[in-house]
Amino acid sequence: TNTGDNRLAALVANNGVGETSLSKTGTGTWILTNPDSTYTGVTTITGGVLGVDKLADGGLASSIGMSSGASANLVIGNGGTLRYTGTGDTTNRGFTLAAGTTAIQSSGTGAVEFNNANAIAYSGNGLRVISLGGVNADDNIMGASIGDQNASNITALAKNDAGKWILTGDNAYTGSTNINGGTLVLGNGGTTGSIASGTVNNFGLLGFNRSDTLTYGGLIQGSGDLQQAGAGVTVLTGDNTYSGSTDVLAGTLRINGDQSSATGLTSVAAGA
């Protein structure tokens, strides 16, 4: 239950007979600092925080071993948090999220990129909230596609803490998107990165960074800011009520909905 940064520097390997698996239980925090662990079993977080200094592609040594990138090999349970604490890594590992609230955080000195574009796997039945958080303000990227488990078990997304996360998957979840702090960006300058037309409760910064045309028809509300940063065209068709600023840094922001209740200031950079 100790929530301080308990650290384990040992190299975790298979036992010579079978696979070793690692399970983080309880409400406390453990940080795995050895980048060369080679165990090939499942890493499970059933509670609290599991911090990792090193992430790598499936099959390569890392703080959570060298199991394959299959989603079944990294499981985050209700109330569990995977916290990246390293200097910057990219991984193609998938993961499985339980029903309830699960979290992925980036709080190292460098950003982390999950570049596996497959759909996130789910276990158990029930509503779920996926939280992306941490204090790292660099370009942390979630490439996996976030969807509902089914029509009865929908998913919502929360962006917590002061850091920045970029969604590059084309996400189909139908729950709300809640930006409680920091920055959430759709797209990383390419032609992917979107959310379904649900409600965005924005109390941070919502960014659009695509090179093509993206239409968003959901409601954007809250006191947060909106930023058009990509070279493409973003079309807002919802009746938005947010009170933060609207900043067009590049490309085109087109309003095809009722923006009269969006009361913040609007600025347009030269050339946008």
Which role fits each region the language model picked out?
Residues 1-9, 13-31, 40-141, 147-168, ...:
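Beta-strand repeat architectures
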Residues 35:
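NAD(P)H cofactor-binding loop motif with strongest signal on the N-terminal glycine-rich segment
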